[in-house]
Structure formats: C-alpha cells, structure tokens
Amino acid sequence: MVIYLLAGFFLLLFIVLSFIDRRRISNGIILTMALFFSVLSVVYATFSKGNELLVSVMGTVLLLLVLLIPFFVVGIATMLIVNGRLMLKREGRKLANMLPLIIGLGILALIITWFGSILKTGSPILGIVVVFIVALVGYFSFLFLSFLLSTFLYQFNFPRYNQDFLIVLGSGLIGGDRVPPLLASRLNRAIKFYDKQYAKKGKRATFIVSGGQGANETISEAEAMRGYLIEQGIDENFIIMEDQSVNTLQNMKFSKAKMDAIMSNYNSLFSTNNFHLFRAGIYARKAGLKSQGIGAKTALYYMPNALIREFIAITV
C-alpha cells in the first residue's frame, strides 16, 4: 500500500512542479522516483495476487533483467568507447571530445576491479573501496538518468506564435569569423519559427544574436550571426546584437537587458541545439526570463559527448 502511495505522490508532485516551471532538474529526479516506485508497485501487485502464471512470468522477467545487467553495462561502455574514438576522429583531439572514451574505459576498469575484489577475498580494503566507488557511480547514474528525462521532456515545447524577440545563443566560430554548422542550425531553427509566426500571425519578431568575441575570433559571434541572418534574407532592422556575453548565463542576462530597454512587457523565445536546450532553460530562469526554448537537431554521433558535458555543467 505504501509503495502505491509513494508512486502516486511522486507522480502528482512531478505534474504540479512541471506545470509551475519545467526548467528544473528536480522535476527529472521526482519523475525518476515516480517511475521507480511504479515499477515496484507492478512487481508487488503481481506477486501479491498469488497467480502462479503471473508470478512465473514476472519472476522470469526479473531474472532475465538481472542476468542482462552485466551485458548491458559492458555494452554501454563499449558504445561510449566507440563514440569517443569517432569524436576524436571527426572533432579533433581535445580533452572535451574524449569524455565518452574516458567514461567508457572507466566503466570497464570498474568492472575488472569489481571482479578482482571478488576473487581476491583476502583484501577487505579493496572491497570497501570498490563498494564506495560503485555506490558513487550509482548515485551519479541516478542523477544522469534524471537529467536525461528532464532534457527529453523539455524538447516538447510548443511556444505560441506571439513572440516579440527570438534570442539565438552563440557558439565558437570557424576561422575566427565564420558561422559553423552547429551555430547555423540554431539560426536556421530561429528563422523557421520567425517565418512561421509571420505567416500565421503577420507579426515579425526581432532577433537578438547573443555571443561575445573569443580569444581566437576576429569578430564577435553576434556579428557573425548577424551577417548570417542578413544573408538568409532577414531585414537588418529586425536584428539586435548582444556581443559581450561569454557564457550561457550571460547570454540570457545581457539579452534580457536589451529587451527590457525596448519594452517592459514582451514575449521571448531562445534558440539553441537540442542537447543544450534544458540547461539554457535553467539559465533563462536564473536570469529572470520567462522564455522557453526551441531546439535545433544535432548530429547523432555528437549527442553522447554533448549530453555528458551538459550534465557536468549542471551538476558541478
């Protein structure tokens, strides 16, 4: 009975908090708890009924799941290693691109150490260390699952076509002055919304291109984005540059200042890549913006590394 109440409580709490504000990782944590207790409820209900067929089926399913766990973990580690090698090949040998490879090798090392501790039963210290590491990995795995749920659910935004401003978040430039494909996808996503809003409502939104100038860049990201929008046929009178920000939180804060200076009551929307959408939403909330986001598609091979980096940025 308690399990049912906990499942219902966490599910109801998730619905209420999501309705208030979807831009919180705590929503994902609560949903994970709701799913966990829901599964426990199903298992408990099955065994409590005493139906031999149902109990046999459920017992078989649970046994198979337990037996598959090691293969599942090794499979994830292998996929991360393969993805890490692909990232290094396509994106260059940078530490940030090595994250999937490092984590994949770390998981395999943990598995080997775990089996080593089982075989070497005479070393209690090794056993304690392994248990501690496994508990730590379990904790962060729970948080990562909650983050993935939050990120996935936040993709389903259906903004109204009444926006006054479209904020496009910057990223690094190619050759110091050119818009890379990643940034172009953000701009194209904003243009698509701009065109659709104008077609439906006859209302033109103003673009705010937000991004400062990096050490290896000859112009600001905002200036490069402005040039890209003009090339795509956007009237320069509907483009505002915010060229001082150096991170996502500043993107939001400085863009808000630009919008506040123009009007006091407005609707705004930000555009970024789908993997970055949830964290950008968190920073929008911290900056005092009611803005929700729209996400541009990202190459599939890039997603594992990008999501790991987003998770680290949120939790650290």
What residues fall within each predicted segment?
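A structural signal for short, hydrophobic/glycine-enriched beta-strand patches
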Residues: 155-307
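Extended hydrophobic blocks
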Residues: 1-160, 261-316
